[in-house]
Curated annotation (Swiss-Prot):
Core component of the LINC complex which is composed of inner nuclear membrane SUN domain-containing proteins coupled to outer nuclear membrane KASH domain-containing nesprins. SUN and KASH domain-containing proteins seem to bind each other promiscuously; however, differentially expression of LINC complex constituents is giving rise to specific assemblies. At least SUN1/2-containing core LINC complexes are proposed to be hexameric composed of three protomers of each KASH and SUN domain-containing protein. CDD domains: SUN2_cc1 (cd21438). Highly expressed in heart, placenta and muscle. The modification Phosphoserine is found at S12, S39, S55, S120, S123, S147. One of its GO terms (molecular function) is identical protein binding. This is SUN domain-containing protein 2. The gene is Sun2.
Length: 731
């Protein structure tokens, strides 16, 4: 049976017994006399026990009794200590003594004692001092809620133990410092031994790893070096951790209890304010709204408790007045209820009113919390629906946009493809028509040449017949002449010799004529074939071509003066060049630690020695180099040289420059130069490519800047092998 049920049962029994009691005057007088005969200590004990049950504050749940003593003892402190009401309170305490001996109520008192609210129970053992101390503690509160220390279960003994732990921790820390000061040799010996062994292991491992890495391929070594650097860092961290653990027993553990207790106390003091210091992020907005509403509900409950306390004070004053009137009436000889019956009646009324108020407060609180939760759920559901609608709308818009972009892209690509196809088809048709015309002309010329070649034997035969027809007539005329003429004739042998010589001359002449006609035909045919793209050369032409090629090669392969040649007096202004790209390949290392890297300076681009790898590389696809020429000239062209694809290990030259610009400067200190031209290097073309300036009138310059805008796709660096500048001297 609960406490409320027992009290109601007791009150009903008292009411039934009160009908047969004696007169109120005698009972009141007797009871008052009995009470005033008690000792002061007994009176205070009964008052403390009665104040514990006077007016419990309204609370939710089973913890409502833990805050009872504040309201009861504050009322007693303000109104009832030393008043006639103490007599009535003593009687009610006698009626409720059997309730305090029950296990349920004693368990509740133990819980209150742990929270710092069981002052009345401790007063039974300590007397007046404990009771006054409990009254002072509860009267100092302002809201009916216990402090954070009371809720956490802190007592004076706990504070004393934490202070002793702090003092012991400080003493152990001082002893550790004193040990370090008085005995430093041991500490430094351990530290030196640990550093020496660690360094020996580190250098040995680095040497072995260096040998292992250098015997592997380049890519494998790079990946392995990265992994080993990471492993070395991990080893260093492990060594530091081991060192900290090694020195841990020497005194670091003395600081742990003090730090832990201080941190726990700090966290317990800061715990109620955590929700106020959090950032109002989107993720915790709902939780913060619930917390704020719960706190507002707590403030309302505090206000309601204050109102209930004030009403209870008013009811107590009115009850006191009623008792005084009743006592006066009893002394006057009138017949009325006894004092005990009146007290039982009033206490039953107060308990019923208290139960009603608690039930109403519980219902109102539950209804209010349910309304708040329903509102929060509705808001959360509405926010979720709005967010889902927005997401769906955004996804639909993005899908529509993507579909529109796809259709636009398809239409644009189809139109562009059709336009390019039509243009390409027209160009091919025009080229085909021109080729047909040229082929027809070539066929006609070939037929005419064939006809001329076919007529050559007939011409030779006609010439021979003409000679044979003319020779007998000459002989006949010579033989029929006079003797004087015959005396000048040669002998037969001489005549045969003359005839043989004449025949040789005729054959030589005919051969020359045939060769001349053949050369003319071959020359005309070669010109025609050269126009059509078919090259047919003779041995003489081959010799001439080879001779010209060798001469061009001896003339620096382009046959133009290079005013940017370093051996001719040109130089690179290194302070106005891009940063050189480091290859990260160490030529000199110690225990795997690189000490010196090899890298080419910008001077390489002014030197004629060109072979793979002997170039100047700068970081990224963009860079520049400023060159002072050997003389002031009027620039006409520039030449850019790169290694061919056939000499590249990967058969690609993605590090070659693509788009570049040439600027001219009047002096070294000039910040911005004059743009002379913008060109593009073709990676599929010749290794040496010359670019001519289009300006008709060019000023004279002695400082030229080569500015690389893009390369052919290498993301890390760009290479320049040789740069030349051509022009006319200013004088």
């Amino acid at each position: 049976m609960s406490r409320r049920s027992q009290r109601l049962t007791r009150y009903s029994q008292d009411d039934n017994d009160g009908g047969s009691s004696s007169s109120g005057a005698s009972s009141v007088a007797g009871s008052q006399g009995t009470v005033f005969k008690d000792s002061p200590l007994r009176t205070l004990k009964r008052k403390s026990s009665n104040m514990k049950h006077l007016s419990p504050a309204p609370q939710l749940g089973p913890s409502s009794d833990s805050h009872t003593s504040y309201y009861s003892e504050s009322v007693v402190r303000e109104s009832y200590i030393g008043s006639p009401r103490a007599v009535s309170l003593a009687r009610s305490a006698l009626l409720d003594d059997h309730l305090h001996s029950e296990p349920y109520w004693s368990g509740d008192l133990r819980g209150r004692r742990r929270r710092g609210t069981g002052g009345s129970e401790s007063s039974k053992a300590n007397g007046l001092t404990a009771e006054s101390k409990a009254s002072e503690d509860f009267f100092g509160s302002s809201s009916g809620y216990s402090s954070e220390d009371d809720l956490a279960g802190y007592t004076d003994s706990d504070q004393h133990s934490s202070g002793s732990r702090l003092r012991s921790a400080a003493s152990r820390a001082g002893s550790f410092v004193w040990t370090l000061v008085t005995f430093p040799g041991r500490l430094f010996g351990l530290l030196y031994w640990w550093i020496g062994t660690t360094w020996y292991r580190l250098t040995t491992a680095a040497s072995l790893l260096d040998v292992f890495v250098l015997t592997r391929s380049r890519h494998f070594s790079l990946n392995l070096k990265s992994f080993l650097w990471f492993l070395l860092l991990l080893l260093l961290l492990t060594g530091l951790t081991y060192g900290a653990w090694h020195f841990y027993p020497l005194g670091l553990q003395t600081l742990q209890p003090a730090v832990v207790s201080w941190w726990a106390a700090k966290e317990s003091r800061k715990q109620p304010e955590v929700w106020e210091s959090r950032d109002a992020s989107q993720h915790f907005q709902a939780e913060q709204r619930v917390l704020s509403r719960v706190h507002s509900l707590e403030r309302r409950l505090e206000a309601l408790a204050a109102d209930f306390s004030s009403n209870w004070q008013k009811e107590a004053i009115r009850l006191e007045r009623l008792e005084l009137r009743q006592g006066a009436a009893g002394h006057g000889g009138g017949s009325s209820l006894s004092h005990e019956d009146a007290l039982s009646l009033l206490e039953g009324l107060v308990s019923r009113r208290e139960a009603t108020l608690k039930e109403d407060l519980r219902r109102d609180t539950v209804a209010h919390i349910q309304e708040e939760l329903a509102t929060l759920r509705a808001e959360h559901h509405q926010d979720s629906e709005d967010l889902f609608k927005k997401i769906v709308q955004a996804s639909q818009e993005s899908e529509a946009r993507v579909q529109q972009l796809k259709t636009e892209w398809k239409s644009m690509t189809q139109e562009a493809f059709q336009e390019s196809s039509v243009k390409e088809l027209g160009r091919l048709e025009a080229q085909l028509a021109s080729l047909r015309q040229e082929l027809a002309a070539l066929t006609l010329k070939q037929n005419s040449v064939a006809d001329e070649v076919g007529l050559l034997p007939q011409k030779i035969q006609a010439a021979r017949a003409d000679v044979e027809s003319q020779f007998p007539d000459w002989i006949r005329q010579f033989l029929l002449g006079d003797r004087g003429a015959r005396s000048g004739l040669l002998q037969r042998d001489e005549m045969h010799a003359q005839l043989q010589e004449l025949e040789n001359k005729i054959l030589t002449k005919m051969a020359e004529m045939q060769g001349k006609s053949a050369r003319e035909a071959a020359a005309s045919l070669g010109q025609i074939l050269q126009k059509e793209g078919i090259v047919g050369v003779t041995e003489e032409q081959v010799h001439r071509i080879v001779k010209q090629a060798l001469q061009r090669y001896s003339e620096d392969r382009i046959g133009m003066v290079d005013y940017a040649l370093e051996s001719g007096g040109a130089s690179v202004i290194s302070t106005r060049c891009s940063e050189t790209y480091e290859t990260k390949t160490a030529l000199l290392s110690l225990f795997g630690i690189p000490l010196w890297y090899h890298s080419q300076s910008p001077r390489v681009i002014l030197q004629p020695d060109v072979h793979p790898g002997n170039c100047w590389a700068f970081q990224g696809p963009q860079g520049f180099a400023v060159v002072r020429l050997s003389a002031r000239i009027r620039p006409t062209a520039v030449t850019l040289e790169h290694v061919p694809k056939a000499l590249s290990p990967n058969s690609t030259i993605s590090s070659a420059p693509k788009d570049f610009a040439i600027f001219g400067f009047d002096e070294d200190l000039q910040q911005e130069g004059t743009l002379l031209g913008t060109f593009a290097y073709d990676q599929d073309g010749e290794p040496i490519q010359t670019f001519y300036f289009q300006a008709s009138k060019m000023a004279t310059y002695q400082v030229v800047e080569l500015r690389i805008l893009t390369n052919w796709g290498h993301p890390e660096y760009t290479c320049i092998y040789r740069f030349r500048v051509h022009g006319e001297p200013a004088h």
